[in-house]
Amino acid sequence: SSAASDVYKRQVYKKAHDMLMEAIDDGTFITDKDKAYYVYELTMDGRTQTGIVACASIDDYLNNVIKKHENTRADKELDRINHVDTCSAQTGPIFLAYRANAVISAEVAKAKQEKPVYSFTAVDGIRHKVWKISSKESVEAIENAFAGINQIYIADGHHRAASAVKVGLRRREANPGYTGNEEFNYFLSVLFPDEELMIMPYNRVVKDLNGLSEEEFITKIKEKFTVSGSSTQVAPSKKGEFGMYLGKKWYILTAKEEILSSDPVDGLDVAVLQNNVLEPLLGIHDPKTDKRIDFVGGIRGLGELERRCDNDCVLAFSMYATSIGELFAVADAGLLMPPKSTWFEPKLRSGLFIHRF
């Protein structure tokens, strides 16, 4: 029954709280004595990205200084709200992005000349390094620089962010005399400059051709795209280009001029594919709920698309990755990114930094 599972869930959240407290008591987690920022560097396959670990303001989120590009699901939020609320802590940071700033970049470069506080390679081969910035001048320089940045974007972690904000609002209700400086007014984040971020493509695989033969399907595709065969796997090299795998053959698709759009959402490659192929030809109206389509993160490679087509699918599309600039443009326009349009890699590690409130 749902009542029994609610009790079970409460026990799970309580267990998380107890384990966190034990880890604090036994010195696994150490509370910082001074006001500091941390520089957090992740290296994957020789590519490095460096962010700043900080707390973001729930007011900035509510006032849209922190911009979103995805709707959240209430059920996914509730789980995270309960977890954060029961633990009185955020253990997984929100992945935020901003337009690169010279002052912040200089402070980060300076910090990286020191010895890191942490340096380890995780089991998945991703290298994590952390430096601390605690000198008063540097902390103030970074704080002032961020104060002047009026657009910050959620790259990944919309559910975590929405949940952290809702817990903060709960605490405000419980403490009507709040000043706005209490820790519950802030949530744990890592902020990355746009130029450091890598978005990987999110590829598509489809279960059937909606009653069309391969020939009929290709004929219809040719109305909107130029199509040429390829003897090797196709990873698109530019926007407006798509790889297609069908009948054990790869093709390069290039969108014709008339289906391109300058609209921040309709102009995205994932939207071009959805609006000109998936919906009209294959009858996939809502890719979020349609069981005939599946999504494969770019990290898994093109061989995975071939494997799926040998297995439970008949058709695959390899995408050109969405750029961070495209994501910013969608968020700036107050619009939503289409489902499964960005795959951020590497993922931030949970439990490395914890924000208690």
Feature annotation, model-predicted:
Residues 1-357:
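Surface-exposed, charge/polar-rich loops and edge strands
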